[in-house]
């Protein structure tokens, strides 16, 4: 997929953590199209390996993963790096949002994914992170 040019927008290093293959492919493709550099993991173990090896400006993650919770990933990520965490989940109840915030998620978006909303969130966090002009 060709990368779109959005003048003045920051390029972010984003880790996408999503166990559903089709959703992961759509997310990585679209975020890459927006001009961001994307790494993708499908479980807690691979997400933690990425965090040990690379700096990220943001993590966009499903909460429920096959080998644990993304809350574990976010806690570790926030210990290691200054980044913004975006939860993507089908669970939008207050208790779920609170649990995500307690773990360190900065934003909580519900599925099905509203890509315009996700893009708006990323545009808001770009100036606060170390992205580069696209």
Where are these regions (language model features)?
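Acidic, metal-coordinating helix/loop segments flanking the phosphotransfer/catalytic sites
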Residues: 40-58, 98
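Acidic catalytic/metal-coordinating carboxylates
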Residues: 43, 69-72
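Alpha4 helix (beta4-alpha4-beta5 surface) of REC/receiver domains from two-component response regulators
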Residues: 72, 92-107, 120
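Active-site residues of response regulator receiver
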Residues: 62, 89
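Short amphipathic alpha-helix used as the core "switch/output" element in two-component signaling
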Residues: 49, 71-82, 122
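Non-catalytic signal-transmission and effector/linker regions of two-component phosphorelay proteins
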Residues: 1-21, 28, 116-134
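A Lys-centered signature of the CheY-like receiver
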Residues: 111
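Two-component/phosphorelay signaling modules centered on CheY-like receiver
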Residues: 21-39
